[in-house]
Amino acid sequence: MHQTVPPGRAYDALALGGRFRGLPAWAVAFGGGMRAVRSHAATPRYRMPVLPNVTATRYVTPLREGGSLPAIVEADDLGTYVVKFHGAGQGRKALIAEIISGELARRLGLRVPDIVTVDLDPVIGRHEPDPDVQDLLNASPGRNLGIDYLPGSLGFDPLAWTPDPGFAATVLWFDALVGNVDRSWRNPNLLVWHGDVWLIDHGASLYFHHAWASAAKLVAKPYDASDHVLATFIDDEAVTQAGRELAPQLTDDLLRALVDLVPVDWMEDEPGFDSPADVAAAYVTQLRARVADPAAWLPEVGPARPARPPAPRNASRPRWLDR
């Protein structure tokens, strides 16, 4: 993660041992504790600052794994970001979901790369030969979304590592709350970086905002965890217990503060609403209703998979050595 700290963003170092109030025990035990936590994370009321804003200075390379064609971009704060563009297929709603869900996950003690808004002049990509990239940049002038680039991070492999049950239960409960369908075995959207696991790519969550007219019907929609990458590591009781601990943290103050992080202009001209304030209120109402009745949407995950036994000490010893 880049070393510069944008103005107005104070951090408290978290020493090992979990002395940070309100941090789940697993967040300390898992990977040696969080590297940095916003200084106001433990306060009962939430006064979140506006997301930091940077200006893109260099288009580095497109990321072709995703259909929306995000890119690695350098910015004027000397940081490097994965930028998602408002001119991509899902438009600004995917960026809104990234902010609300990503920052909600952070407030639940999960690791999420820093999120910023990125001012973009399409001219920075003028030397990019791909016409699809040119079209996307030209469709995305102005404010876009940046997610801190984690250099050297690796994709999470559930076959190589058994996650802490508390961590797995928290992630699944969070994904169920926001309706995140993009945490599957095929595409975990989890990165391992410096020994910690980080959550990324929440643009497919909050799918209710694609059909506001029927959003109320989706409040109690059960979450399908059959393909969730962490479902086999926990049982129903673990997810329920995670909810008992997490739901009280999601107060009206916090939900409003999360939604207030979204740039106002991204909520303009929404069909069925008179103003961006009405759109923001609708997000809070939907999330509040979801938090209030988790029994309606919590998935059944069945019994946890037993932990893998340790490999025999000489498991990799060639047989011919024993002849």
Language-model features and meaning:
Residues 35-323:
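Phosphate/dinucleotide-binding and metal-coordinating scaffold of catalytic cores
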Residues 14-16, 23:
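Leucine-biased recognition of intrinsically disordered, low-complexity hydrophobic segments
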Residues 1-13:
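Extreme N-terminal basic, low-complexity initiation segments
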Residues 16-17, 33:
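A cross-taxon signal for low-complexity, glycine/charged-rich
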